[in-house]
Amino acid sequence: MKILRLQDLIAAGQVAGQRVFIRADLNVPQDDAGHITEDTRIRASIPCIEMALKAGAAVMVTSHLGRPTEGEFKPEDSLAPVAARMGELMGREIPVIANWTDGVEVAPGQLVMLENCRLNKGEKKNNEALAQKMAALCDIFVHDAFGTAHRAEASTYGIAQFAKIACAGPLLAAEIDAISLALANPKRPLVAIVAGSKVSTKLTILKALSANVDGLIVGGGIANTFLLAAGLSIGKSLAEPDLVGEARAVIDAMKARGAAVPIPVDVVCAKTFSPTAEATVKAATDVADDDLILDIGPQTAAILAAQLKAAGTIVWNGPVGVFEFDAFAHGTETLARAIAESDAFSIAGGGDTLAAIAKYGIEKDVGYISTGGGAFLEVLEGKTLPAFEILTKRAAG
């Protein structure tokens, strides 16, 4: 994927004295009092901003925050707490500018934060007049918000159409590189883990991956539907019986390519869904009518761990059991540690996956951790994200 990168423009001396508009993802969680409870996204966006400032640019940064009503400002929708936190981290005052679409005064070496872009009428519908106004504010537009790369909005897509120069910031560029490594040109064997409660929410991903991967590991409620497709009983476990045909089609598609969806040989069951429930390991053929399957068994975990250690590339989306309950966390932990020990290039994404990575402290052993959420899932579905599409188009002239 050929895109223009901010670091390339800086290296070519094209950024000094220019007005740079950065679309970041600063959509951080806040408590009821408006205090930021988790600042990873703010920290992740600072390298791009500092890069532009060091190069001598006049820098404007904006983001969405929450779900405000367009055209109606409410104090809780303001980026002021974000600017304050970013200012603490960067050791500088960051003024917040409201009603900014008609013009912003910013000098080289200066940084301002443009108020919540979703307050602008026409933002979400990618209104052309709004996008042109935004583009007129800058000489260079920098997209550095992978979390919004799957949305075609005025501040993510429209501005990139009309700005003099449109490029990717370091965060977005890293996502593009990791995705290309994992999916476009993977080192084989390519093994994917797709887990979650429902086949219905991940069906497009399962179908897309079944045409490309060498091994497709399913987990969570999704695996229960695949157990049904393999003719096994799952007791009262969470599953979608109406999607058994779809699961079978995925198994058949993999088989036709000489690949496989490994079906668990043993599972961990309980009688109730509770952190204190008694865990019992059973053969997958011995599940009782009143059993709930809450994890893969140790034998299955060992087989899958060996497959992951032998992989060339690993794509991981979702924990394979109820890892929040320690009695049902063994499967997820075993696979997480196998990914950490594997020589494969690994890319992981999705909220629960990130929580599992944090729980087992393997952040440094995963090749790339995607913070994209919905954008990451759309990439796995084989879709071309609007942000990638417009930046590629602009790079091609």
Swiss-Prot record:
Transmembrane segments: none annotated. Its EC number is 2.7.2.3. Keywords: ATP-binding, Cytoplasm, Glycolysis, Kinase, Nucleotide-binding, Transferase. Substrate binds at D25, L26, N27, R41, H64, L65, G66, R67, R118, R151. One of its GO terms (cellular component) is cytosol. GO terms for molecular function: ADP binding; ATP binding; phosphoglycerate kinase activity. Gene3D superfamilies: Phosphoglycerate kinase, N-terminal domain (3.40.50.1260). GO terms for biological process: gluconeogenesis; glycolytic process. It is found in: Cytoplasm. Belongs to the phosphoglycerate kinase family. HAMAP family: Phosphoglyc_kinase. Its main location: cytoplasm. The lineage of its organism: Bacteria, Pseudomonadati, Pseudomonadota, Betaproteobacteria, Burkholderiales. ATP binds at K202, E324, G350, G351, D352, T353. It is an enzyme of class 2 (transferase). It catalyses: (2R)-3-phosphoglycerate + ATP = (2R)-3-phospho-glyceroyl phosphate + ADP. Pathway: Carbohydrate degradation; glycolysis; pyruvate from D-glyceraldehyde 3-phosphate: step 2/5. This is Phosphoglycerate kinase.
